[in-house]
A protein has these predicted regions:
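Alpha-helical transmembrane segments of multi-pass membrane transport proteins
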Residues: 1-405
Length: 405
């Protein structure tokens, strides 16, 4: 009963701070501070400084700003236009037509970005005008973008997997490799849904595409070569053991700069904008991770994680039952918090439960990302829905309905 009282206290302070407009990272530190003051005699200030510094100076964490910077650089190149020109000849003859470019484009860009928002914005600004001009159903255009953009959370280099790995001190490279196949399977399922919908829908009447010969398709595919080389360098260097995740991220930044320069889109303005964009995003995530580290330490002093793990053990839940409970919990949490915040907020309590149940932490990381992907397109806080609303000027209810399938 005492454990539930502590949980209620932590949740009350957390939602009080978040409801007051305090940043998530600072709110986590505030909750941890209250816990340390009430349940320990340790000097809170010294503990907080030491914990925040340790969390912020982690070598593993250096991969995060580098991958974000790589995505920011590519966002400001002509990569999206080139991808559409390279993919559209191959997608046009499939059931569902050019809507598949949303899915394949998001899959490809996710492999060089790691950010769901960057993937959505980059592919969306290219595909939405083109698909509208060809009279594809608006709900399908928006729905496939909303869903496929979440692949940026699964396919390496995924920022969510990096944050998860840093939070539980797990190998980033192993998490990346584990995310490749599930990401491709999800992309295939999205494409299957589009193909089936195009055959049964009565509103599907796009403008026919001109037929191209095989040689013409191959010629247009040359626009995909730069991004495929970059993907091979970043992912291949990790897979073959030539580089760690951080070193691969550095290769990605260099490759992104070279790609931008070769396209003539690299100048001081784009360079500084990409650097500042990456700095802002990285600082936000680093603050959340620092707050989560302090909160984890505070919870450790209270004995809450171990107490909850023992309680779960007393309930004698099977692995499947535990996963179903956590699935419902994260779906509800995802309605109010973004994916990264959901991960760092809960891992201090959830990780001991998972270890106690004997569930592999790499597998559970992929499970969490799939649920977080749902949160990205779940009202009222689904971030992808807000991005799409700004791009299409549709009502939030319309976009949410389009994203349901």
């Amino acid at each position: 009963m005492e454990d539930f009282s502590i949980i209620f206290l932590f949740l009350f302070v957390l939602f009080l701070l978040l409801g007051s407009g305090v940043w998530v990272g600072l709110a986590l530190m505030g909750v941890a501070w209250v816990g340390m003051e009430l349940f320990t005699t340790r000097p809170v200030g010294d503990v907080m400084l030491t914990t925040v510094w340790s969390a912020s100076s982690s070598w593993t964490l250096t991969a995060l700003p580098l991958f974000i910077w790589m995505g920011e650089i590519l966002y400001r190149t002509r990569l999206s236009e080139d991808m559409f020109r390279g993919l559209s000849p191959w997608m046009a003859r499939l059931p569902g037509g050019l809507v598949h470019t949303n899915i394949v484009g998001c899959t490809v860009f996710a492999a060089v970005s790691g950010s769901s928002a960057a993937t959505l914005t980059t592919v969306g600004k290219m595909s939405i005008p083109e698909l509208r001009r060809r009279r594809y159903p608006e709900t399908m255009v928006i729905g496939t973008l909303a869903g496929a953009a979440t692949l940026g959370l699964m396919i390496p280099p995924s920022l969510t997997l990096i944050v998860y790995g840093v939070t539980i001190n797990e190998s980033i490279s192993k998490l990346f490799f584990a995310g490749i196949v599930p990401g491709l399977v999800l992309a295939g399922m999205f494409m299957g849904y589009v193909a089936i919908s195009s055959q049964v829908s009565k509103t599907w009447n796009p403008t026919p595409e001109p037929r191209l010969s095989f040689l013409q398709k191959v010629e247009n595919s040359r626009f995909l070569i730069p991004v495929m080389i970059l993907i091979t360098v970043v992912i291949g260097s990790m897979y073959l053991g030539y580089a760690t995740a951080t070193e691969a991220a550095a290769f990605g930044v260099i490759g992104g700069l070279v790609l931008a320069a070769s396209q003539g889109s690299l100048n001081w303005k784009t360079f500084s904008e990409s650097l500042m964009g990456a700095t802002r995003t990285s600082a936000m995530i680093a603050l959340i991770l620092a707050g989560a580290a302090f909160l984890s330490l505070s919870m450790g002093f209270t004995g809450l994680p171990r107490g909850l793990a023992d309680l779960i053990a007393e309930w004698d839940l099977s692995r499947f039952e535990l996963l179903m409970v956590l699935l419902i919990f994260y779906i509800i949490l995802g309605c109010f918090l973004d994916g990264i915040s959901s991960v760092v907020l809960t891992m201090a309590v959830v990780e001991p439960m998972i270890r106690e149940a004997g569930i592999d932490l790499i597998w559970f990381g992929i499970f969490i990302v799939v649920v977080v992907e749902m949160a990205q397109i779940t009202p009222p806080i689904g971030f992808n829905l807000f991005v799409l609303q700004g791009m299409t000027n549709h009502e939030m209810s319309y976009i949410a309905k389009a994203a349901i399938p």
